[in-house]
C-alpha cells in the first residue's frame, strides 16, 4: 500500500513467523503475560510500548500466539483502554509539535504545509474511528485544545 502524502510505495514490512505456536523455551504462560500487560498498562504505557517491553525483556514475540488476544483487547478487558487510539494520539502530538515550531518560525512555509497534511490525516483517521465507534460521534479535533489532549 502506498504512502498517503509521499511518493514512496511503502512495501517493506516485518515478517511474522509461520508457526503460530508458542516456542518451547518461553517460560511465561498466558496468565503471566496478562499480568505483565496489566502492570505495564497501569504505568500508562501504550500497547506498542508494552509489546516492545514484552519482546525485549521477556521473549514474547507475539502476545496473540501466547494469549489468544491482542494487547489492546487485553487492556480493554482489564479496563485500561486509552481514551483515544494510539495512532491518532501520535498524529495529534506531531501536529502540536509542528504548531509549536511555527509559533517560533513564522516564515516556515514547508512546516505550514506539513501541518496541513498532518491535520488532514487526523481528520480522516477521526472519521474512521467514529464510524467504528472507537471515538464518540461528537469528538472533534481542534488545534486550540489539541495540546491538552497530548499533555
From Swiss-Prot:
InterPro entries documented for this protein: Ribosomal_uS15, Ribosomal_uS15_arc_euk, Ribosomal_uS15_N, uS15_NS1_RNA-bd_sf
Keywords: Cytoplasm, Nucleus, Ribonucleoprotein, Ribosomal protein
Keyword Nucleus: yes
Subunit structure as annotated in this protein's UniProt entry: Component of the small ribosomal subunit. Part of the small subunit (SSU) processome, composed of more than 70 proteins and the RNA chaperone small nucleolar RNA (snoRNA) U3.
Pfam families with a match to the protein in the record: Ribosomal_S13_N, Ribosomal_S15
Cellular component per GO, a single term: cytosolic small ribosomal subunit
Protein name, as recorded: Small ribosomal subunit protein uS15
Coiled coil location: none
